[in-house]
């Protein structure tokens, strides 16, 4: 289970284009929504949010305390970023019922060493960086481990169905989805091309003589 965090939010009365003034003063506008509750406009100190986001990411439960509302269990669901600076300019919190399963995207962490990658013959080709799972909010893992130590030949790969999931967690991503595989390095491809080039070609004169002999026998 992921670590639980607590965050205090203030109700926000500034809406629309006026939120630019909040951002200039170091305040991040946000919205809390979820099944069975009306969306709540809130605000938080931008630095405090950044600190929580670095630790919690999008898979750890956060207990939200908002004046005038009961505590809410939520995830950081979506972020809006400035198109140039990439600073976070708005956050969405998704409140959840701890008794009901939810579907979320969980990051994949690569562990282990592939013998072919270590020898320089191959490079790792990671196709998916997250997978979709379904679980109770309290059972959602911070990440799913992908062990690549068994990738010792180019015909081996890891698909979503091969991942080891914790108890109570169900895979939502299609099982046949490729997670990670191996690709030849340029150096290895170059060696194969050199080997092919070194194979002596049959002299033209020998081929002509062989073809003439076959015609005579016919």
From Swiss-Prot:
Task: State the function annotated in the UniProt record.
Answer: This is one of the proteins that binds to the 5S RNA in the ribosome where it forms part of the central protuberance.
Residue span of region Disordered:
185-218
What InterPro entries does the record point to? Rbsml_bL25/Gln-tRNA_synth_N, Ribosomal_bL25/Gln-tRNA_synth, Ribosomal_bL25_b-dom, Ribosomal_bL25_C, Ribosomal_bL25_long, Ribosomal_L25_dom, Ribosomal_uL5_bac-type
Tell me the domain of life.
Bacteria
Specify the protein name.
Large ribosomal subunit protein bL25
Q: Which Pfam families match?
A: Ribosomal_L25p, Ribosomal_TL5_C
Q: Which family does it belong to?
A: Belongs to the bacterial ribosomal protein bL25 family. CTC subfamily.
Q: Cellular component terms, GO, for this chain's entry? A: cytosolic large ribosomal subunit
Query: What keywords is this UniProt entry annotated with?
Result: Ribonucleoprotein, Ribosomal protein, RNA-binding, rRNA-binding
- Gene symbol here is rplY
Biological process annotations from GO: translation
- The reply to whether Metal-binding figures as a keyword in the UniProt entry is no
Q: CDD domains of this UniProt entry?
A: Ribosomal_L25_TL5_CTC (cd00495)
Q: Where is the composition biased (Basic and acidic residues)?
A: 204-218
Q: How does it assemble?
A: Part of the 50S ribosomal subunit; part of the 5S rRNA/L5/L18/L25 subcomplex. Contacts the 5S rRNA. Binds to the 5S rRNA independently of L5 and L18.
- Gene Ontology molecular functions: 5S rRNA binding; structural constituent of ribosome
């Amino acid at each position: 289970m992921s670590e639980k965090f607590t965050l205090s939010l203030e109700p926000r009365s500034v809406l629309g284009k006026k939120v630019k003034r909040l951002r200039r003063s170091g305040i991040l506008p946000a919205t809390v929504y979820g099944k069975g509750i009306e969306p709540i406009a809130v605000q938080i100190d931008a630095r405090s949010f950044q600190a929580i986001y670095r630790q919690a990411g999008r898979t750890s439960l956060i207990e939200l305390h908002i004046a005038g509302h009961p505590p809410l269990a939520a995830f950081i669901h979506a972020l809006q970023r400035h198109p140039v600076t990439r600073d976070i300019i708005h956050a969405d919190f998704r409140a959840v019922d701890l008794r009901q399963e939810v579907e979320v995207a969980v990051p994949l962490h690569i562990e282990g060493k592939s013998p072919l990658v270590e020898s320089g013959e191959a490079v790792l080709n990671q196709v998916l960086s997250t997978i979709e799972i379904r679980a109770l909010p309290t059972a959602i893992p911070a990440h799913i481990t992908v062990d690549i130590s068994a990738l010792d030949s180019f015909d081996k790969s890891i698909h979503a169905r091969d991942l080891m999931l914790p108890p109570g967690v169900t895979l939502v991503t299609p099982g046949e989805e490729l997670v990670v595989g191996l690709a030849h390095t340029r150096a290895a491809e170059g060696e194969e091309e050199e080997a092919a080039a070194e194979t002596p070609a049959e002299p033209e004169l020998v081929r002509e003589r062989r073809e003439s002999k076959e015609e005579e026998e016919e």
